[in-house]
């Protein structure tokens, strides 16, 4: 078993990271931060000054104090530091169910003490129930804080060791047993940012369970768990149906959905699952009425409105798609709980010899000074949660009908600034004092104005755009709409009119007010399209003149993200490849991996996968669910023998190939389809 090196962050003498973690307990909202491991070291040949070092961990076995003490004991010997010795260690693991920080103190040599600390800093005794909860939270954090291969999560928090919490069927039984025992308390853990109110089937526990089943392909285990839970509460049917669909048992899924909806006709998770399934089969006509009923059953949830918008997009009812998008309730994005640590005295990031390879060296990354200001100002890359999903839907419409047609539809359904002024002048001339029906908006309950901070991308009504936003290409700048002004009392959103074929938007009275956040999205999309058009035009001109089109690696990375946001996969792959030709980039390699998946290029997929896995190991991550899923699907489709042969034939050092063989070994341990061959 190849393991990563151990990062060391040296704490400043004036601050204790353990005390700061204790102070931050009361501000934790959901699953909590990664585990903290704090060691005290002193020189081997003297009893001189002691120094505190720490790192973070996800995925370690937190089922008992003994397992955490065992982890600390693995850190006693360090091949990178032979002048100091470890005298004590403290392992802190957050229990999100009971809002306690479980701690194990190990004296070396000496005793082991376990206890827990509450939000007030009081020291309490740890019970068996506490350890069960802590173990489950630890597994869920391992999946929640895992990197998708792009390196974004790894770069966000320095010095985190990531382990796979479930490496065999025995560990799986332990995990699923804990999940079954604590399932009905799962709503206490919170939920993904797209969910307004965590409930029995939409929370971090159910998300983690579905993620585990999808990653490992252990559909039978997931079905068995949810079938048992469904006997206690029929609401679990939506989760069971999703696992049936994942496991290619669609007939059972359809039968289950039919029975469950007869029992609970207004259960929105069931309706959403059914609508999603109908959409995947190209039956938008069936999905439409289901999605409408889902909106009625949960009008304050973003997911139901987003699904209805997807249905309208698939039916090419662009006006209804925009009106539905305008009605989406938007939520302020709440990021995952992360460590809030003081500035360290210094940081030591040793590299394991098994993960060292010149080809994946990204240490020569260039700085921001080589990135054009216009590229750095693109704010769409910062969208998260509901705003990211809404932007994705808007860009999907743009890809299918074009920017000009989108602006035309927008002006047909929303009140534009120019016509509002004209209408207001007419009203003043007629001395009309009654409120016009045209100012009644299709309102969202959210009053959040998630205005992107980039100055050059978004303008409020009446503002003058900066010179950098002036058009120098063929992308027309959108006119401003009249936006709905947020108020303290906002009515619940109402579904758009049900019969779009007979709607006429030519009259001012039939139009809607555009929510401010959606108006902002149009302006951000305009800036994305403007930069994209300039890039493609310049690239074509250079190509026609047989000249090299030069950008820095960071610029190619940004352009790849831009094309990906705009649903231009071929252009994105071109940018990723140009970036990788200059230096290794995990984000670029993850983009190329997606391109190889799309093209069905098995050798290309495995080549990208080997390099990504090695880069992950280099930065202390032994586990990425996304990469496990990719290699599992390859083994399922091509067979384990072929996959192993292609890996072994790759012209990279053997110790690098062994890291990928270790990932493939997980599939054999779980007896995944294709691993027997």
Where are these regions (language model features)?
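Non-TPR docking regions that flank or precede TPR/alpha-solenoid scaffolds in eukaryotic proteins
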Residues: 1-677
């Amino acid at each position: 078993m190849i393991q990563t090196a151990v990062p060391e962050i040296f704490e400043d003498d004036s601050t204790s990271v353990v005390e700061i973690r204790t102070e931050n307990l009361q501000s934790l909202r959901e699953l909590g931060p990664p585990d903290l491991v704090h060691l005290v070291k002193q020189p081997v040949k003297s009893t001189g000054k002691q120094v505190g070092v720490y790192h973070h961990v996800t995925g370690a076995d937190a089922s008992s104090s003994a397992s955490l003490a065992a982890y600390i004991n693995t850190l006693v010997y360090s091949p990178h530091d032979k002048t100091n010795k470890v005298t004590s260690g403290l392992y802190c693991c957050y229990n999100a169910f009971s809002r306690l920080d479980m701690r194990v103190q190990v004296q070396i040599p000496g005793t082991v003490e376990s206890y827990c600390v509450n939000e007030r800093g009081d020291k309490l005794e740890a019970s068996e129930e506490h350890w069960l909860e802590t173990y489950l939270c630890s597994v869920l954090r391992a999946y929640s804080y895992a990197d998708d291969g792009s390196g974004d999560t790894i770069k966000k928090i320095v010095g985190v060791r990531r382990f796979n919490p479930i490496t065999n069927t025995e560990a799986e039984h332990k995990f699923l047993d804990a999940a079954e025992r604590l399932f009905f308390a799962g709503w206490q853990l919170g939920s993904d940012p797209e969910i307004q109110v965590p409930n029995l089937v939409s929370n971090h526990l159910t998300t983690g369970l579905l993620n585990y089943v999808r990653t490992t392909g252990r559909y039978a285990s997931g079905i068995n768990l949810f079938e048992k839970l469904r006997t206690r509460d029929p609401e679990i049917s939506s989760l069971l149906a999703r696992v049936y669909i994942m496991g290619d048992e669609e007939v059972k899924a359809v039968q289950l959905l039919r029975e469950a909806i007869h029992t609970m006709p207004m259960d929105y998770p069931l309706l959403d699952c059914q609508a999603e399934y109908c959409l995947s089969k190209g039956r938008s006509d069936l999905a439409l009425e289901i999605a409408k009923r889902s909106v009625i059953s949960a009008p304050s949830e973003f997911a139901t409105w987003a699904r209805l918008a997807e249905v309208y997009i698939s039916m090419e009812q662009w006006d209804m798609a925009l009106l539905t998008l305008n009605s989406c309730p938007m939520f302020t994005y709440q990021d995952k709980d992360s460590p809030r640590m003081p500035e360290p005295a210094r940081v030591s990031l040793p590299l394991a010899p098994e993960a060292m390879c010149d080809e994946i060296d990204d240490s020569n990354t260039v700085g921001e000074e080589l990135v054009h200001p216009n590229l750095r100002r693109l704010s769409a890359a910062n969208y998260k949660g509901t705003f990211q999903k809404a932007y994705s839907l808007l860009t999907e419409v743009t890809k299918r009908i074009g920017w000009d047609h989108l602006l035309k539809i927008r002006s047909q359904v929303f009140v534009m600034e120019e016509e509002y002024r004209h209408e207001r002048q007419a009203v003043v001339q007629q001395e009309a004092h009654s409120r016009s029906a045209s100012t009644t908006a299709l309102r969202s309950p959210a009053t959040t104005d998630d205005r992107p901070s980039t100055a050059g991308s978004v303008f409020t009504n009446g503002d003058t755009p900066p010179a950098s936003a002036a058009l120098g290409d063929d992308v027309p700048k959108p006119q401003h709409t009249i936006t709905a002004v947020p108020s303290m009392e906002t009515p619940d959103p109402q579904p758009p009119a049900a019969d779009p074929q007979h709607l006429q938007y030519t009259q001012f009275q039939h139009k809607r007010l555009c929510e401010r956040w959606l108006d902002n999205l149009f302006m951000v999309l305009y800036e994305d399209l403007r930069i994209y058009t300039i890039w493609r035009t310049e690239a074509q001109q250079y190509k026609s003149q047989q000249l090299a089109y030069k950008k820095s690696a960071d610029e190619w990375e940004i352009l790849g993200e831009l094309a990906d946001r705009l649903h231009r996969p071929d252009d994105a792959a071109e940018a990723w490849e140009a970036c990788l030709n200059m230096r290794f980039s995990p984000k670029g390699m993850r983009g190329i991996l997606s391109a190889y998946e799309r093209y069905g290029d098995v050798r290309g997929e495995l080549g990208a996968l080997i390099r990504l896995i090695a880069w992950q190991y280099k930065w202390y991550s032994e586990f990425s669910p996304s990469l496990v899923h990719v290699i599992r699907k390859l083994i399922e489709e091509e067979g384990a023998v072929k996959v192993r042969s292609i890996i072994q034939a790759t012209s990279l050092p053997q110790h690098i190939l062994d890291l990928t063989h270790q990932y493939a070994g997980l599939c054999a341990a779980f007896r995944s389809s294709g691993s027997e061959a």
